[in-house]
Amino acid sequence: AIDFETANGKRTSVCSVGVVIVKDGKIVNKIYRLIRPAPNYYTQWTTAIHGLTYDDTMEAEDFPDVWAEIKPLIDGLPLVAHNSPFDEGCLRAVHELYDMTYPNYKFYCTCRTSRKVFGKDLPNHQLHTVAERCGYNLENHHHALADAEACAQIALLIIPDPPKPKKAKKADKDTHVGDLFASLIPQQVKKNK
């Protein structure tokens, strides 16, 4: 599971990353790194969300150096995020900013899957709400590692055996995460559509 926090409204402004590596249903590694954001400024509203400031990341490494450490640890693994379009968008944006080749990581979304699995049984599908529903106590919400760990715990419960990543065929480009896990959705939720 992966989670990014950003310094401002730009997707390239990743200022921290949390990665939780799961193999055979067990958490085997946790990584948390601060990143010098690009552009390197913080807004009041982002700092209010995650608590990070310019001083926290002033001496942090740039994204390429941080990613050089993380990339070999996740090669070949699917990535799971809560609201994956945001995290995947950040990852693509910083790869483009630094002229790095993007390896077309396969992303799965616990938020989208939660909507399929829990439907209207939850008041919303925010990370802390879904984590609580799955019996996980999310402390320190909006800390990248805490959020990645909550996402991993959710995925272990609602995506117990995600499909192995495969190269997308032309017909697969319109496949959505929810479609991949349709067999996991309880019948009563399917009927509510």
Predicted features by range, described:
Residues 103-114:
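Conserved beta-strand -> loop -> alpha-helix junction used to position metal-binding or nucleic-acid-contacting
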Residues 4-8, 112, 150:
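Short, glycine/acidic-enriched loop or turn micro-motifs at the edges of active sites
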Residues 147:
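Conserved catalytic/binding loops enriched for acidic/polar residues
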Residues 1-104, 120-142:
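Conserved non-catalytic scaffold segment of RNase H-like nuclease domains
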Residues 133, 152-193:
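Acidic two-metal-ion nuclease catalytic site recognized across multiple nuclease folds
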Residues 91, 113, 151-155:
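Buried hydrophobic packing segments
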